[in-house]
Amino acid sequence: MKCISWTVNGLRACMGKGFADFFAAANADLFCLQETKLQAGQIDFAPPGYHAYWNYAEKKGYSGTAIFSKQEPLRVQYGMGKEEHDREGRLITLEFPAFYFATVYVPNSQRELTRLDYRMQWEDDFLAYLQTLDQNKPVIFCGDLNVAHREIDLKNPKTNHKNAGFTDEERGKMTALLGSGFTDTFRYFYPDATGIYSWWSYMFHAREKNAGWRIDYFITSDRLQPKLRDAKIHTDIFGSDHCPIELDIDL
């Protein structure tokens, strides 16, 4: 099973930069989007052969997620069932016979860390949600987790130590998640790889200099490790400040 995740930073803008071509060429079984920045009816994208699921933020032009699946799921859930977290279109979960599959756009802690306290609450509630799913079936989830976990996951760790996405608090929550029975699939295959990132600022020619961060992930329940085949980061694909990531798994 081939899974793709891409934080598109506005799907309408990305459509003008080759999105549909990449979608068709990828031919993924599951294709996930984060940061769609859409409201219902604002785009006409219904690829043949896929079931489409969209979650929109109440605030226009903000956040949003989508999943395109070749197989129709047993059930779809939008959000995690907590009103304070479910207004921004950040989470979609599909239930299949043998596993759960979710895409998520984790809240950014913002400059000056103005949303860090909220982010910490989100992290605790999201982990509890994942653990509840995991008690029933193994879980795969993907998306922009808005954290570089280790120093090798960004180009400039020292100068970013207290910036959103690389605070001790955010990294600690990621450590806790991975210590709760979940696997960072890219690091499973490439534990020491450096210089491979999924996001680059639009400023300072960051992508040209590869001054990036790895903040997009495919995470699975640990018990799916024997079924993992590869994890990829498509740094050659443009169209957003993020590039697509991929998981190949025998399911």
Model-assigned labels for residue ranges:
Residues 60-75, 196, 203-226:
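Conserved beta strand-loop-helix elements of the APE1-like EEP
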Residues 7, 23-41, 101, 130-151, ...:
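Active-site beta-strand/loop signature of hydrolases that rely on acidic residues for catalysis
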Residues 1-9, 98-110, 142:
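Active-site-proximal beta-strand elements of phosphoester/diester hydrolases
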Residues 70, 94-97, 221-222, 240, ...:
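Active-site beta-strand termini and strand-to-loop segments that position acidic
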Residues 1-47, 51, 57-62, 177:
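N-terminal, active-site-proximal structural segment of metallo-dependent hydrolase catalytic domains
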Residues 81-82, 107-123, 158-163:
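Surface-exposed cleft-lining segments at the edges of enzyme active sites
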Residues 37, 42-109:
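Structured beta-strand-rich core segments of catalytic domains in phosphoester-bond hydrolases
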Residues 51, 125-211, 215:
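Metal-dependent phosphoesterases centered on the DNase I-like endonuclease/exonuclease/phosphatase
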